Amino acid sequence: MGYQATLAILADPTRQVLVERLRSGPMPVGKLASGLPVSRPAVSKHLRLMKGAGVVRVTEDGTRNLYELDLGSLDEVRRYLDRFWDTSLKRLKTAAERSYEEGKRRRPRR
């Protein structure tokens, strides 16, 4: 899946919380659902959608499933956003250099 699917998945506030929690490592559904204002089945549904979009992957640990972030999909989003940063930083660099050069021309020589 592309960065669009990942961004769509991350637009949901509950899924954003799940991603934040998974930053610390793999977790079972029960731990992920703890303290959320949605039911455990709702969290399971969110995780299925996230898995389908490639945001998380599941590994079996005995009788339970552990969910963990799939950094590949998040890396696609980072690469997409980097294009905007690259353009913005180039503009900032150009503006700073122009301002510096204009300042040098205005200063009286000693």
Regions found by a protein language model. Name each.
Residues 1-2, 9, 21-35, 40, ...:
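C-terminal regulatory/oligomerization modules of transcriptional regulators
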Residues 8, 13-14:
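N-terminal beta1-alpha1 ligand-phosphate binding loop
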Residues 47-48:
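Short, hydrophobic-biased segments on the C-terminal half of alpha helices
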Residues 60-66:
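Short, Lys/Arg-rich nucleic-acid/phosphate-binding segment
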